[in-house]
Amino acid sequence: MSKDIRVLLYYKYVPIENAKEYAAEHLAFCKSIGLKGRILIADEGINGTVSGDYETTQKYMDYVHANPLFSDLWFKIDEENEQAFKKMFVRYKKEIVHLGLEDNDFDNDIDPLVTTGAYLSPKEFKEALLDEDTVVLDTRNDYEYDLGHFRGAIRPDIRNFRELPQWVRDNKEKFMDKRVVVYCTGGVRCEKFSGWMVREGYKDVGQLHGGIATYGKDPEVRGELWDGKMYVFDERIAVDVNHVNPVVVGKDWFDGTPCERYVNCGNPFCNRRILTSEENEHKYVRGCSAECRAHERNRYISENGLTRQEWAERLEAIGETLTPANA
């Protein structure tokens, strides 16, 4: 079956004058050609993922490259059977990547155009993975790591990327004197984070140029030493990386069986991303905890039209009960 849709992943750090106005112009153009996706535009640059048919995505790439600021912008292209997005969003933000540092932190202003880690090609990164003296650090959110990661990479004890700088500071004595290489989905987070590590005093910091997305497409490494799938922030959720010897590393939240299917916890005040089968999603009413399963706002209940009696019976089947307030 031919794949008629292209998904474009890209970013570029470059100063953009009147970025807020440019974001509005950018959105108008994207809508005029029927493009779908999500784009962030800030004073420091642009970061986006978009999808459309061949003609639409080609028009978009030509439009972007026609701007002198983005004439050399690197598009990473996936071919798919279906659209990766349902709508088109272009938003102006203060930053395209937020490190989560305090406003008074002297390292708060990280400019990757001035300070960033050394770029590693996929081949060089693979060599780093095999080097016992090199620390490989995953800079993504916890749920991204759980779906797939490089073999031997460290999973920081964090929930999201914004917590990573503090985690690195808390563990500085473990890594300061070692070579550290970092990676993320497409490279945009690592550009800034590796620069922050250099500012923190790390002497030997590297980053996977182009991110996991590029590593999986490299004709020489072919994604080897990647385990699981790569989490992406669109309708696809998970994409293949390892084309040599792929394995499943994701585990069902409820029973630990191999799983690569993500859902959000039904409790809107939790919304945690969890891996689970369709069977367990229904069994546990899409709640990641007893509290979430019995929460009065659990979206699974309304989405599936469960009566309170049916809801209570589901919970009783797993040894739980609705709270008195919800009974």
UniProtKB/Swiss-Prot annotation:
Gene Ontology biological process terms in this record: tRNA modification
Record keywords, A-Z: Oxidoreductase, tRNA processing
Keyword Oxidoreductase tagged: yes
The family database entries (InterPro entries) matched by this protein are listed as: Rhodanese-like_dom, Rhodanese-like_dom_sf, Rhodanese_C, TrhO, TRHO_N
Q: Which reaction does it catalyse?
A: uridine(34) in tRNA + AH2 + O2 = 5-hydroxyuridine(34) in tRNA + A + H2O
Query: Which residue numbers delimit the Rhodanese domain?
Result: 130-224
Which protein is depicted? tRNA uridine(34) hydroxylase
Q: Which EC numbers characterise this protein's activity in its record?
A: 1.14.-.-
Instruction: Name the catalytic site residues.
Output: 184 (cysteine persulfide intermediate)
What is the gene called? trhO
Molecular-function GO terms, alphabetical? oxidoreductase activity, acting on paired donors, with incorporation or reduction of molecular oxygen
Keyword set includes Cell division: no
Q: Classify the source by domain of life.
A: Bacteria
Residues spanning the membrane: none
UniProt organism field: Streptococcus suis (strain 05ZYH33)
What the entry lists under SMART domains is as follows: RHOD
Output the CDD domains linked to this UniProt entry. RHOD_YceA (cd01518)
The top EC class, named as a word, is oxidoreductase
Q: Which Pfam families match?
A: Rhodanese, Rhodanese_C, UPF0176_N
Family recorded in the similarity comment: Belongs to the TrhO family.
> NCBIfam families of this UniProt entry?
PRK00142.1-3 (NF001135), PRK00142.1-5 (NF001137)
